[in-house]
Design a protein with these regions (language model features):
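Conserved CoA-thioester-binding segment of acyl-CoA-metabolizing enzymes
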Residues: 1-38, 59, 73, 77
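Glycine- (often His-adjacent) and acidic-residue-rich active-site loop
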Residues: 20, 39-71
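Short, active-site-adjacent cap segments at secondary-structure transitions
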Residues: 42-46, 90-92, 106, 197
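Glycine-rich beta-to-alpha transition loops that act as phosphate-gripper elements at the mouths
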Residues: 85-91, 144-149
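CoA-thioester-processing core
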Residues: 91-144, 174, 178
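Well-ordered beta-strand positions
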Residues: 103, 143, 147-149, 155, ...
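C-terminal long alpha-helix characteristic of the crotonase
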Residues: 106-107, 111, 162-208, 234-238
Length: 238
């Protein structure tokens, strides 16, 4: 079992470097290796580093979006078990990363979780959308995507974002136990079963037409203006 602890700045905001590093860490694992993914403090991940996006503009975005999708699909399709120990806020891309795990445990006082992309003004890449479609209970899927709402752990478990609410002091211990239990299953059968479960989502992720349309929206001047405004409002609140 491998413990991967996110540690990238104050909020584990997803930059190009973050995505490439996490992809590389998973690529270096043996295929059947169980993984526990967690972070420190009160934030699991605040999602995409919007400051980098707004500063880097279109040239940065054209590199970042493929790296983001590769990272998320790498975690989602890892043949071994992946358990997310969500220690704190998991917002936007941070929520998607958590939902790429097979088992999701969240600390009782772990803050909020949800996908806020619609509020930022950017569409989901197909990889992110399909991960969320797999995680969220069908009756709550449209609400979660189109409202941009974030949820308490109790609200999140009812909607499928997470599977269990755990006391903070035992979160990591429980996550390791869950990963160890899954790792004890016959690895070849586990990997194939997981691939069969994910097959429809993995097929829907292959949408070059949507990728191009999404990149066009992300790189549009009006979108970048909206992102800058969202960042400014967020900083004022904090």
């Amino acid at each position: 079992m491998t413990l991967l602890r996110l540690a990238h700045g104050k909020a584990n905001a997803m930059s190009l470097e973050f995505c490439e590093a996490l992809t590389a860490r998973f690529a270096a694992l043996s295929p059947g290796r169980a993984v526990v993914l967690t972070a420190g403090g009160h934030i699991f991940s605040a999602g995409v580093d919007l400051l980098r996006v707004s500063e880097g503009g279109a040239p940065y975005i054209r590199k970042f979006l493929p790296a983001l999708s590769t990272m998320l699909s790498t975690v989602f399709s890892h043949p071994g078990s992946v358990v997310a120990a969500i220690n704190g806020h998991a917002i936007a891309g941070g929520c998607v990363l958590a939902c790429a795990a097979d088992k999701r445990l969240m600390a009782r006082d772990g803050g909020r979780i949800g996908v806020t992309e619609i509020l930022v003004g950017v569409p989901f890449p197909p990889v992110a959308m399909e991960i969320m479609r797999c995680a969220i209970a069908p009756q709550f899927f449209v609400e979660a995507i189109l409202s941009g709402a974030t949820y308490t752990p109790l609200e999140a478990v009812a909607r499928g974002f997470i599977h269990e609410i755990i006391e903070p002091q035992t979160l990591l211990e429980r996550a390791v136990a869950a990963a160890t239990s899954l790792a004890a299953l016959p690895p070849t059968a586990f990997a194939l079963s997981k691939r069969q479960i994910h097959a429809p989502a993995l097929e829907r992720m292959q949408r070059p037409d949507l990728d191009a349309a999404i990149e066009q929206i992300w790189t549009a001047p009006e979108t970048l203006d909206h992102i800058r405004g969202y960042v400014a409002r967020t900083l004022r609140k904090s």
